[in-house]
Amino acid sequence: MSFVILVVLGLIAGTVGSLIGLGGGIVIVPSLMFLSTVTQLFQDVTPQVAIGTSLLVIIFTGLSSTLAYIKYKTVDYKSGLIFFIGSGPGSMIGAYVSKLFNSNSFSVWFGIFMILISLSLMLKAKARPINKAHKGIIRTFQDDAGEPYTYSYQASVGIAIAFVVGFLGGLFGIGGGSLMVPAMMLLFLFPPKVAVATSMFIIFLSSMTGSVSHMISGHVNWLYALALVPGAWFGGKLGAAINRKMQTKTIVMIMRIVLILIGCQLIYEGIFS
């Protein structure tokens, strides 16, 4: 029974994560923590195990999504590798700091973070890119439909933002795409589909470094990961396909509401349990 639950959870996480560039951890971590409170099947889940297992699964979500987006020619490899200079070390440091959490403090901080992610998704939907002259690294990109895009960024700024995103990803086990995608779109003028695809590439890379830190600390439940990975793999491909064919505004709006509700519930549990 637990295997079936985890496969379905992985599928949902992979689909949602790939669809809007979140990475999937935003579904896996709170779900594992919730399951640990309602059934003895998952009673050994601690915040650290949820985070470490999530990051390991996100490697496969990120890889699956990246391979799908490569087919659609929307991954900016050069920018992704530049940003990984920041996100890689950031995820390792975040993974180390996560050891300081107990269940209550994790619930409070993760709840706050989920609400911030919801606000970030709202910002991505409502805000408009900052008009600026192209300077620094200038990228000209053409998708598989032949549509050309031009955008630019200062490498130092991009790396600094990616470090913070990587740190939060390693700390909470969520990949960090929820913060990276709006930054890429609003500050650097990345086209939305390129931002999501490149974000999944960055998540794939930084999740490897973050999960290694958690593996060393013994924070990965390999049986859970074995069940989560198949669903997350196919979910990553499904999310990329849906992203290509439909507007995601409705899904993002639902996600924002759900994130706020779950975030408030986690904060309440962390304070009053």
From Swiss-Prot:
Keyword hit for Nucleotide-binding: no
Pfam families: TauE
Entry GO terms, CC: plasma membrane
Lineage: superkingdom: Bacteria
Residue ranges crossing the lipid bilayer per the database entry: 3-23, 50-70, 81-101, 105-125, 157-177, 185-205, 222-242, 251-271
Keywords carried by this UniProt record: Cell membrane, Membrane, Transmembrane, Transmembrane helix, Transport
Membrane topology of the entry: Multi-pass membrane protein
Main location class: membrane
Locations listed in the record: Cell membrane
Stated family: Belongs to the 4-toluene sulfonate uptake permease (TSUP) (TC 2.A.102) family.
Protein name: Probable membrane transporter protein YunE
Biological source species: Bacillus subtilis (strain 168)
